[in-house]
Amino acid sequence: MILTMKLVHPLHHSLSSSIPFPSRKRQSKPYRCSLPSPGCEKVIRTETVLPPAPVSCEGRRVLLGCLLATASGILSTGSAEAVSTSRRALRASKLPESDFTTLPNGLKYYDIKVGNGAEAVKGSRVAVHYVAKWKGITFMTSRQGLGVGGGTPYGFDVGQSERGNVLKGLDLGVEGMRVGGQRLVIVPPELAYGKKGVQEIPPNATIELDIELLSIKQSPFGTPVKIVEG
């Protein structure tokens, strides 16, 4: 009687003893994904990549160290800039209203930092970062989200508040700023959410805006975010 024996490899091979196999790619069907821009679609093909040849533990440690060092260098620049901006805003928020400049329309502003770039005038297409606060509590901001420094700039044309496309206080507050500047604006109710209020903001509420002018462009820049509700 002849016995046939099969050799079964254990499931827990170490990385160093695994048998390398060449990478293979399996292409799947394309799918469509909607993009932020209206009416814009892009066909994206996905690929399923099977595991390549195993890498030794030592090699993985070296690679991981390099990746962490690179990521740390990239993130530190954006993070340092964001911290510097928020610190300036915090110091300015403690200033008395008497230090602010009052415009005829009731808007009050204080330039935390005066930029040295182009000036935003009516008709300029601008990109800004903003933080909107009510009684010191942030209720809306463009700084929160993805990206190295966090958030996505908000782009709009100065003067569009007349059409209801942008909050009046933000529109009027950015006018006269220069690229690279940061401004704290106290917005009266009539230039904010008026007698109706919006969500957690009550009627006749005065709000504050921390605005940083990033650039002035001739082409669209930033992601439009509706900050006028109702």
Swiss-Prot record:
Broad EC category: isomerase
MF terms in GO: peptidyl-prolyl cis-trans isomerase activity
Function: PPIases accelerate the folding of proteins. It catalyzes the cis-trans isomerization of proline imidic peptide bonds in oligopeptides.
Keywords, ordered alphabetically: Chloroplast, Isomerase, Plastid, Rotamase, Thylakoid, Transit peptide
Protein's name according to its UniProt entry: Peptidyl-prolyl cis-trans isomerase FKBP16-4, chloroplastic
GO CC, alphabetical: chloroplast; chloroplast thylakoid; chloroplast thylakoid lumen; chloroplast thylakoid membrane; cytosol; thylakoid
Pfam families: FKBP_C (PF00254)
Family named by the database record: Belongs to the FKBP-type PPIase family.
EC number from the UniProt entry: 5.2.1.8
Organelle targeting sequence: 1-56
Reactions accelerated catalytically: [protein]-peptidylproline (omega=180) = [protein]-peptidylproline (omega=0)
Subcellular location: Plastid, Chloroplast thylakoid lumen
PROSITE patterns: FKBP_PPIASE
Domain named PPIase FKBP-type: residues: 123-217
Organism, scientific name: Arabidopsis thaliana (Mouse-ear cress)
